[in-house]
Amino acid sequence: MREIQPSRREFLVSGAAAAATTTVDAQDRQAVVATQPAQPPARRSSEPIRVLTATAFEPHELERFKSAAPNIELIVVKTPAEFRKRLPEAEVVFGTLTGADLPAATNVKWVQAGNAGVETLDREFMTSPIALTNMARTFAPAITETAMGMLLCLTRGISTHYVPQFARREMKPVGTAKSADHVELAGKTMGIVGMGGIGSTLARRAHCGFDMRVVGTDAKPMPRPDSVAELHDPSWFMTMVPQVDVLVAAAPHTPATERMFNEKVFRSMKKTAYFLALSRGMLFDDLALVRALKEGWIAGAGLDVFPVEPPPSTHPIFDCKNVVMTPHTSGYSPDRQTRLIDLDVENLRRYSIGAPLLNAVDKKAGY
């Protein structure tokens, strides 16, 4: 172990002050930082940095933005009309831009998106030269806690045996449960697709907290974290699938990942394996998953995301007993908002001195 500069993960989880003295393993740090920081355009340090936002930040959050650098000028608007009117003044936007905004965004150099995923952003903006950063990794602590909670509900029989007792207002007699319905995670293998913020954090929690063996794939070359036994490129995906006891969708939504978890994948999984969908619903074929659950191809699924959100009440997923679902809420927590503001402030500070920005998005790759 040796002292190094804090990674974006330590910064986002602990805050700027705590991160300054953080000691972590260098290999793990590099593995989590999947995207290289973006170098902002050169600018005169004395010029005011006008930041435009329509987001309803709290007053104390706005004060933190102003504290990032002495020349920060905030332009806070409440309506789309105000946003368009003030856009020509802005150098930085906290929010999003559309193709229709671009003619007025003549001075905008950098957009800080409010979400981790950027697949829904306007195509014209995504092909523009404006730098883009996102909120990746700020959601990871909350999402991965939800993921482990879902997995425990499935493996420990909580969702199938213990939750329904409240609807019936009766508890099954002691000794009637079957040991076969209660699986232990220690020694099991988790396979993660997408070793970004969610994937790398989940790997560490599964391995260090539950003694699981973790393997994974990622489209970007990166050092293997200590918590991961094997890390390969996406070509290893179908080799990995039959090996794992838990298969996790944690990759961004791109043309390459859309519906990658399909009938072939679910049929290739162990009958005792579980599927977790954490990043984007468009990564899996929902009807194929329903068949997998109903026909026993897999043991169960935990879903925080769905292809269409929310799914209609007539969707057959609601007929499945071996599934745990949440309405895309796994990233929610008061602490998440603190991490979001920490990232905004740190990136404003970096921008003001011409330092690389954190969480840079490769617009061409889509994440």
Enumerate the predicted regions with their spans.
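Glycine-rich, N-terminal phosphate-binding loop of Rossmann-like dinucleotide-binding domains
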Residues: 15, 97, 115, 249-251, ...
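An N-terminal-biased, well-structured beta-alpha scaffold segment characteristic
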Residues: 8, 29-132
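N-terminal secretory signal peptides and thylakoid transit peptides that target proteins
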Residues: 2-18
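Rossmann-like adenosine-cofactor binding region
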Residues: 219-316
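Short, conserved loop/helix-junction motifs that constitute active-site signature segments
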Residues: 101-107, 124-128, 266-270, 292-296, ...
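Glycine-rich Rossmann-fold phosphate-binding loop(s) that bind the pyrophosphate
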Residues: 195-196
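C-terminal helix-to-coil terminal segments
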Residues: 33-36, 133-134, 138-146, 154, ...
